[in-house]
Regions:
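Surface/interface-facing alpha-helical segments and adjacent flexible terminal/loop regions used
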Residues: 1-260
Length: 260
């Protein structure tokens, strides 16, 4: 199965405020919502932003929706973006930001690859690591373990941030499908006490966050915020950080494995 098929949502379709406040076991609806959010984050780094998305982020009432789902602090940067939004001016600036930050290796390029941000410590400081090193090998092994296949049409390396988010989307989609087959709620074990398929994908999600995304995304986030010309990408970085924090905590919550 291809884990990198493009999702074309012009606006984020992430968890609602109610879904972020989990009260019980994981459901297939929540897994689908999380897949949508990871798919949106993947596209944020893999394709230039559409004018529709930029306009959506610039609408005044969006900050209330984002604050309800992710918290006022996480939504503050996009709120500031909306308060001073001018469609023609900001569309050009945001699109240029995309190319300068993620595509063109010149002055403001942030090199969005895990390998780069997990270099070998030198005199107490992190150096930038080589591409396709040990971290890339570990990532590829995890992709294969999960049954994910890289889209041959994409030219990005496997440790590109957009690819890693796409892999999380794939895992959530697989979890949702497994949950649907099992009646809609996660149980860690089946009747024969063997690990269930849905629990396997949940375990892979937690492991990939802990072993990979959470190890380097904060440093990438700092680079993006330091080099952006507009508040658009720093705003979505704040949302992404809040979502990853929530998802990591939720996946480590034993209640997620509780029988309904």
């Amino acid at each position: 199965m291809n884990c990198l098929e493009r999702t074309d949502a012009a606006t984020p379709v992430g968890p609602s405020a109610g879904q972020l406040k989990r009260q019980g076991p994981l459901s297939w609806q929540e897994a689908r919502a999380r897949a949508n959010m990871y798919g949106f984050l993947s596209n944020l780094f893999l394709i230039p932003p559409s004018q529709e998305l930029i306009k959506w982020a610039g609408e005044d009432d969006r900050s209330h929706e984002l604050s309800a789902a992710f918290g006022e602090k996480a939504a503050a940067e996009l709120k500031a973006f909306a308060e001073d939004f001018r469609l023609q001016r900001d569309t050009a600036t945001v699109i240029q930001d995309y190319w300068d930050l993620f595509r063109i290796p010149t002055g403001r390029y942030v090199a969005p690859f895990e390998d780069v941000y997990r270099g070998t410590p030198l005199d107490g400081k992190k150096s930038r690591g080589p591409l396709l090193g040990k971290h890339a090998i570990a990532v590829i092994r995890t992709y294969r373990e999960a049954g994910a296949v890289l889209d041959e049409r994409r030219k990005e390396l496997p440790t590109h941030i957009g690819i890693e988010f796409a892999f999380m989307r794939f895992l959530c989609e697989q979890e949702a499908s497994a949950l649907g087959r099992s009646g809609g709620h996660l149980r860690r074990f089946g009747g024969n006490r063997k690990p269930r398929e849905d629990g396997r994908y949940l375990e892979l999600q937690g492991r990939f966050l802990g072993d990979h995304l959470n190890r380097w995304f904060p440093r990438l986030a700092q680079e993006i915020c330091s080099n952006s010309q507009s508040r658009f990408y720093p705003g979505w970085i704040s949302i992404a950080e809040a979502f990853l924090l929530w998802d990591t905590a939720a996946l480590s919550n034993p209640r997620a494995y509780r029988n309904p």
